[in-house]
Amino acid sequence: MGQDNIKVIARNKKARHDFFIEETYESGIILRGTEIKSVREGRVNLKDSFALVENGEVFLYNMHISPYKQGNRYNHDPGRKRKLLLHKSEIRKLIGKTKQRGYSLVPLSIYLKNNLAKIELALAKGKKKYDKRQEIAKKTAEREIRRAFKERQRY
């Protein structure tokens, strides 16, 4: 088989900071003509976006795709809800998980795979404030340990 040609367009950096990521899914996304042109230009924002399961289908909300520059009056609505394409078994699994308290569907990134737009969707559980503080403290401690090792290796 051929190589998968992947180009990351946008990442949701806040998602990994605000949530514990439990599982990730790759899903397709239904876009209109001017939307895919804007995505290819990299004019996408995933910051406050989330996904919900409605009537056995998964929809992505608050993903902002800027209007296409050369678009005319048929340009798309930047904040509309967009349908995600997942296998039926994955959707059933997500329905069960998202009904549990604290679980959400959060997009981690949008990318082009063989010229098709894909969303990396995560089943995530929200972090509390103290969880975020612990993670920041752990990262700074690891950074200081690496710095100390680097200093010792110099001499």
From Swiss-Prot:
On whether Ubl conjugation is a keyword of this UniProt record, the answer is: no
Similarity remark: Belongs to the SmpB family.
> Keywords, A to Z?
Cytoplasm, RNA-binding
- What does the UniProt function comment say about this protein? Required for rescue of stalled ribosomes mediated by trans-translation. Binds to transfer-messenger RNA (tmRNA), required for stable association of tmRNA with ribosomes. tmRNA and SmpB together mimic tRNA shape, replacing the anticodon stem-loop with SmpB. tmRNA is encoded by the ssrA gene; the 2 termini fold to resemble tRNA(Ala) and it encodes a 'tag peptide', a short internal open reading frame. During trans-translation Ala-aminoacylated tmRNA acts like a tRNA, entering the A-site of stalled ribosomes, displacing the stalled mRNA.
Q: Give compartment(s).
A: Cytoplasm
User: What InterPro entries does the annotation carry?
Assistant: SmpB, SsrA-bd_prot, SsrA-bd_prot_CS
According to UniProt, the name of this protein is SsrA-binding protein
An example of a GO molecular function for this protein is: RNA binding
Q: Which Pfam families match?
A: SmpB
In the record, biological process GO terms are: trans-translation
Give any Gene Ontology cellular component: cytosol
Q: Does the keyword Cytoplasm apply?
A: yes
Q: Which SUPFAM superfamilies match?
A: Small protein B (SmpB)
Task: Fetch the NCBIfam families from UniProt.
Answer: PRK05422.1, smpB
